Regions:
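Nucleic-acid substrate recognition interfaces
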Residues: 1-416
Length: 416
């Protein structure tokens, strides 16, 4: 299976200059490709009849559609912007200095652009989900995050070795890294990113499945805001140690908001603005590192103890909880599910997803009665019966339990 490992790079001065140059080159390729893409699209809209454009679009799926000679000539003169069209044009337009740089950077930039356009148009077709995919835009050198991608990187003598052009005559070294002990060999995919003047590499490696010993144990995990409950206890997703970081984030966000406005108008981005933005990103990075570390340890421990795990298939986007929304996103429901899914495959364990409409909170784990109408438990408890948010009382059999414990037992029943 493919696993992604993110490591911190420690390049020497020579390779640091090389990485900076490759980041600049990738941004140049992206902007050039976007300009060509938009030009081809505009020419196609202006010179091709709408019925011919529709016919060409249908021909992508239906190969039996035939074109007349004049239609073929028009389509050849004004091709559709695709990965192959744009990358071919950029390759023909290469300047001498570009041959000193790896060609994979250009092709990967065009590939990312094609995927970005595809995601943008797919999001516009969705009718039920929120459209949150923006149109591809030109990249600025002032962006806090820069990077490039390649599929020809290797690990040699515990160092990351990037591919270089055959005519490049300058010095080239392996780059030391920290984060994981990786075996020597080829890497399927490598993404280099520069964040806050630090370089990181995300390496996609084909990793064999490491089956853990059988324990014949089962558990269920009920995801709640700020904590996850399971059969042996509770796991805090947002511990107290993050409170100070969230206060710093709030402080830097307010500073940035003030620096965006000057005399009621949009202000220019000053050096101080980018300094504050860098500090804000460092705080976000620390929060992410802390929570990722905790989640990795928790999910790995779960699969070492249990063979079968049941979790809820939560629709986070549809969960509107007013004041709870911020804490909801901080609870990392989506990231938790992602970790559980890939580790189940990695360790050879079974992961069961409960239907998102399964009433684990309203169902009695003792008799199976499901609360409806005014009997339901809400975020404020139950006004009709005077119960609190964390209390579960079955009005049919009289069973009383903690609300989260009752939900865990209902989820656990799905493993039978």
């Amino acid at each position: 299976m493919d696993l992604t490992r993110k490591v911190r790079l420690y390049p020497n001065k020579t390779m640091l200059a090389v990485l900076d140059n490759l980041c600049d080159y990738r941004r140049y390729c992206w902007n050039q490709a976007l300009d060509v893409w938009q030009t081809l699209y505009q020419q196609r809209q202006e010179h091709l009849p709408s019925d011919l454009r529709l016919k060409a679009k249908q021909a992508v799926k239906d190969k039996s559609i035939l074109f007349a000679d004049n239609e073929k000539a028009l389509l050849a003169q004004y091709p559709s912007p695709t990965y192959y069209t744009v990358s071919g044009l950029l390759t023909k337009q290469k300047q001498d200095w570009q041959y000193q740089l790896p060609s994979r950077v250009l092709y990967k930039a065009v590939d990312d652009l094609a995927k970005a356009w595809s995601a943008f148009f797919d999001s516009r077709k969705l009718k039920t989900k929120k459209r949150n995919v923006g149109k591809p835009s030109f990249r600025s050198k002032k962006n806090s995050k820069q990077g490039f991608k390649t599929d020809r990187a290797r690990i040699i003598n515990s160092k990351l070795v990037l591919d270089k052009s055959r005519i490049y005559k300058g010095a080239w070294y392996g780059i030391p890294f920290k984060g994981y002990d990786l075996p020597d060999g080829n890497i399927k995919y490598c993404s280099i990113t520069k964040v806050n003047n630090k370089y990181y590499a995300s390496l996609v490696i084909d990793t064999p499945i490491e089956h853990l010993g059988k324990t014949n144990q089962k558990t269920a995990i009920d995801a709640n805001v700020n904590h996850f409950d399971y059969t042996e206890g509770s796991f805090a997703v947002c511990p107290k140690q993050l409170d100070a970081l969230y206060e710093q984030i709030k402080h830097y966000q307010r500073l940035l908001a003030r620096k965006r406005q000057a005399n009621g108008k949009k202000a220019a981005r000053s050096n101080q603005y980018f300094e504050v933005k860098t500090k804000l990103q460092k705080c976000y990075k620390r929060v992410t590192n802390i929570q990722n570390d905790m989640l990795h340890k928790f999910t790995t421990e779960i699969y070492h103890k249990y063979d079968t795990v049941v979790i809820e298939d939560l629709n986070v986007q549809a969960m509107q909880m007013s004041k709870k929304t911020k804490n909801l996103h901080r609870s990392l429901f989506g990231r938790f599910r992602l970790f559980m899914e890939y580790k189940a495959e990695k360790f050879g364990k079974e992961l069961i997803l409960a239907d998102r409409y399964y009433p684990s909170t309203q169902r009695c784990s003792n008799c199976g009665h499901v609360k409806t109408g005014d009997d339901k438990i809400t975020l404020q408890g139950n006004v009709k019966h005077g119960t609190k948010h964390n209390e579960y009382v079955c009005y049919k059999c009289g069973f009383e339990a903690d609300r989260d414990y009752n939900a865990v037992m209902n989820l656990l029943a799905l493993s039978e």
